[in-house]
């Protein structure tokens, strides 16, 4: 049994439920409600096939996700999922690289979390790899330069305080620079699509450009989002 087959067997031992979107897997622990997995499937489909023509909008991104076995894992709590990913699968011999490509989503999370976590997988495991100089999650890429502007400067680690003119002020010390880029992509795109427009009071300590109008001031990121080459979604996914 080769490494990939062994890893797949070990993964299926715990994640006994499976759905598929263009070859990308949504994996569920035994107690994950089927309706919640279908919700995740719908959101993934809409992010990837935003024009609803039953084909991926950006086949390069989808191929990257499939080839690298990037997947969404689901369970009733993040604690349960993380216990499987970080302990049991590693003990079973699944590589750390593979585990890092398995993104977690608790089924009891609100709808906004489904939009966020699934988009994280697409951008971090897809766009960042297909377009490394543009969306790569490291210093000096186009998106990193846009983020540095949004944060009021380059900060390898979370600063004690952000400059007053910053509009992206995430202060989670466990979120490193690459993680900050993942979150920045999420905040930018979802704000541009109108998803955050009624959430300012809830999110303003972390993110202030919560509408499309405000995002027009983020010139660097606005240009990336509107570049037709990248086929970035133009319509916010909806829950069926």
Regions found by a protein language model. Give the residues of each.
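Acidic/His-rich structured neighborhood in mature extracellular/periplasmic domains
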Residues: 2, 10-14, 21-160
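Short, glycine-/small- and polar/acidic-enriched structural segments
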Residues: 7
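Conserved aromatic-histidine-acidic binding/catalytic patches
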Residues: 28-32, 106-110, 170-182, 205-213
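Low-complexity, polar-biased intrinsically disordered regions enriched in Pro/Ser/Thr/Gly
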Residues: 83-90, 171, 196-205
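Post-HExxH zinc-binding segment in Zn-dependent metallohydrolases
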Residues: 126-200
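Pan-zinc metallopeptidase signature
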Residues: 178, 182-240
């Amino acid at each position: 049994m080769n490494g990939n087959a062994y890893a797949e067997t070990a993964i299926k031992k715990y994640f006994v439920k499976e759905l598929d979107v263009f070859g990308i897997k949504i994996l569920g622990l035994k107690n994950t409600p089927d309706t919640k997995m279908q919700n995740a499937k719908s959101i993934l489909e809409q992010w990837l096939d935003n024009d609803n023509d039953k084909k991926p909008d950006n086949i390069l991104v989808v191929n990257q996700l499939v080839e690298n076995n990037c997947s969404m894992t689901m369970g009733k709590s993040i604690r349960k999922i993380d216990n499987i990913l970080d302990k049991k699968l590693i003990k079973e011999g699944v590589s750390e690289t593979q585990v890092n490509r398995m993104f977690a989503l608790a089924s009891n999370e609100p709808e906004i979390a489904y939009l966020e976590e699934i988009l994280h997988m697409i951008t971090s495991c897809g766009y960042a790899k297909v377009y490394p100089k543009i969306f790569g999650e490291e210093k000096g890429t186009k998106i990193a330069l846009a983020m540095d502007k949004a944060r009021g400067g380059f900060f390898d680690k979370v600063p004690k305080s952000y400059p007053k003119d910053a509009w992206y002020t995430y202060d989670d010390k466990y979120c490193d620079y690459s993680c900050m880029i993942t979150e920045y992509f999420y905040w930018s795109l979802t704000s541009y699509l109108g998803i955050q427009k009624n959430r300012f009071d809830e999110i303003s300590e972390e993110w202030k450009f919560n509408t499309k109008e405000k995002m027009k001031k983020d010139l660097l990121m606005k240009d990336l989002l509107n570049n037709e080459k990248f086929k970035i979604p133009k319509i916010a996914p909806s829950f069926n």
